[in-house]
């Protein structure tokens, strides 16, 4: 998930990162 396509970061920082 997230704009970066990085689910590992999206789960912590949210879809904006």
Curated annotation (Swiss-Prot):
Main localisation: secreted
Keywords: Amidation, Neuropeptide, Secreted
GO molecular function, one term: neuropeptide hormone activity
Family statement: Belongs to the pyrokinin family.
Function of the molecule: Myoactive.
Highest taxon listed in the record's lineage: Eukaryota
The keyword Secreted appears for this protein: yes
GO CC entries: extracellular region
UniProt modified residues of type Leucine amide: 17
InterPro entries with a match to the protein in the record: Pyrokinin_CS
Localization annotation: Secreted
Organism name: Panchlora sp. (strain SR-2005)
Any Gene Ontology biological process: neuropeptide signaling pathway
Name of this protein: Pyrokinin-5
Keyword Secreted set for record: yes
